Amino acid sequence: MEGKDAVAIRSIVSRAKIAMTDQTPGFKVDPAFVKVKQNNQTDAFYTTQRKLSGGQTNGGSNNSNDKHHYLQDAVRLTSSQAMAAASTGAGSSSGTNVGGSSGGNSVLIPLPRSAALTHTQQQVQQTTSTLQTPVYARGDDGTYALAIDGGDYFLANNKRDFTKQADILLYRYLQAKSNNFKENGVEFSLNLLESGSLFQTWAQTGLTAKLYGALVAMMGSGQGTQVKGSVQGSSRAASVSVQTTQQSRQQSTDTQESEVVKLAKALLKSSADLAKPFTDNPTFKKALTDIQSEYKDYLAAAGKLSEFKKDLGEVS
């Protein structure tokens, strides 16, 4: 019988309506949302994370106690190797075909750095003499090292491949079932886009995201209306719900205004230009258009991540 992991990856790809092939086209991601600069592997973030994941400081000494030590090497395995490693190291059922029906697909499996390896894991490690060029991606729960496409995933063409995104989520799904799910106080989460998730918090704390939410709030309701802003995994970065006076009275007294409202009011107080009627302010309208354009690719990615997360939840 097909295991849960095979169902998970098959469901993900089915919903995305994309065949799992190495030639699968990706969609462009704004470089602003990727810490590593396009075609620049000497970026300070890249080199720093490379040293940290390798257990070295700038001076080359051992850095095993560093807070980034939880980063693990990830290798790309064939479906048969992944099945063996997953059943032994991640608690999967022995009949799981992680790679799905095509058989030639691969999945990411973590290999422990110092823990004693089982015989199966030793065999898997022996088949992978050298890791591909690692890719350091900033996710909702921090920065983690992934070995995909020799660095092409983020660095070479600045695209994010749907199939590889599915692989990453499955990797984290398997990781969630292993003893290494929590290490050195660091926890991983599949809750990417729901209210209160770390991904949502990261998105809301970005200045551009806050500005976007503030502009939408002001455009939709004006200065005096209370709004509730939230970043959703859909076609918008900020979903603004305008509350009437009657609805506001019905809410508990401890309801607080969102950060976007506070920022909106601050902008209104600090800028006479922004305080003008918004529909008559060409500068404001142009700024809003520019920001919406900047978020276009990011919103498409967020929508796909939301679908992936839903599928994983259904089979968990």
UniProtKB/Swiss-Prot annotation:
Extent of Low complexity compositional bias: 84-96, 239-255
Q: Where is this region: Disordered?
A: 82-105, 238-257
Q: Name one Pfam family in it.
A: DUF3713
Q: Which InterPro entries match?
A: DUF3713
Q: Which family does it belong to?
A: Belongs to the MG307/MG309/MG338 family.
What's the protein name? Uncharacterized protein MPN_485
**What lineage does UniProt assign to this protein's organism?**
Bacteria, Bacillati, Mycoplasmatota, Mycoplasmoidales, Mycoplasmoidaceae
